């Protein structure tokens, strides 16, 4: 995939985007990622065509316009790493207020520099562990997402306290999602998650991309999220 291919796919998926602006920012992002990746090993993807397809496009494959209808949306990306999907979503949807929590200081430094280079506004990056960060952001977010960070049972505990009522938890998963759903039953009950998530699977380039969409309907007990040690030691079932 080249840059023009990527832009065409994005125009089909998100027809409202400013293609010229998006193309310009993707180029800046890609060049800076490649430059810094030689020093800091931010991603295993270094070939241009892989970055356009696997790094950018596949990171937002499961997202849809309706997730971003709110014109004053607070979006949290947990463990954004080198910026996907969070920074890329901000490029596509400039109106969002983007919050990123990332515990890796090297990656936080990269993200801060990237935001400056892209001249993005209303991006707030915190160098913290998520379980500590969320304690100060109870019922603050309209949408919380993450990609390949932790098992679902952990993500639910980290995210649900931070969601507003009717807020959305949108988690990108692998083919192992059924096992993760089963392992998350106990914590789902404790978090008063009554509805099953909406599951979407997309087949692309011989791979299956899965998203789990939860809607928060009930307040969460203020004991959550617990400490990381307590979360890890908690029985899955």
Swiss-Prot record:
HAMAP family linked to this entry = 16SrRNA_methyltr_G
Principal location class: cytoplasm
Protein name per UniProt: Ribosomal RNA small subunit methyltransferase G
Q: Does the keyword S-adenosyl-L-methionine apply?
A: yes
CDD domains given in the database record = AdoMet_MTases
Q: Which UniProt keywords apply?
A: Cytoplasm, Methyltransferase, rRNA processing, S-adenosyl-L-methionine, Transferase
Q: Which SUPFAM superfamilies match?
A: S-adenosyl-L-methionine-dependent methyltransferases
What does this chain do?
Specifically methylates the N7 position of a guanine in 16S rRNA.
């Amino acid at each position: 995939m080249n840059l023009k291919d990527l832009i065409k796919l994005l125009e089909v998926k998100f027809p409202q985007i400013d293609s010229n602006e998006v193309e310009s920012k993707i180029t800046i992002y890609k060049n800076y990622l490649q430059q810094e990746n030689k020093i800091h090993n931010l991603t295993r993807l270094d070939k241009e065509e892989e970055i356009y397809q696997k790094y950018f496009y596949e990171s937002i494959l499961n997202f849809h316009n309706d997730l971003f209808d709110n014109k004053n949306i607070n979006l949290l990306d947990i463990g954004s790493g080198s910026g996907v999907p969070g920074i890329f979503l901000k490029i596509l949807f400039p109106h969002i207020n983007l919050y990123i929590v990332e515990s890796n200081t090297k990656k936080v430094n990269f993200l801060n520099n990237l935001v400056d280079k892209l001249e993005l506004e209303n991006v707030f990056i915190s160098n913290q562990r998520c379980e500590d960060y969320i304690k100060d952001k109870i019922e603050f977010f309209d949408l919380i997402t993450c990609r390949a960070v932790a098992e679902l049972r952990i993500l639910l505990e980290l995210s649900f306290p931070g969601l507003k009522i009717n807020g959305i938890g949108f988690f990108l998963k692998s083919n192992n999602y059924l096992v993760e759903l089963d392992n998350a039953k106990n914590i789902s009950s404790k978090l008063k998650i009554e509805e099953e998530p909406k599951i979407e699977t997309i087949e692309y380039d011989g791979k299956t991309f899965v998203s789990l969409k939860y809607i928060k309907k009930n307040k969460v007990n203020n004991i959550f999220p617990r400490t990381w040690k307590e979360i890890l030691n908690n029985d899955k079932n």
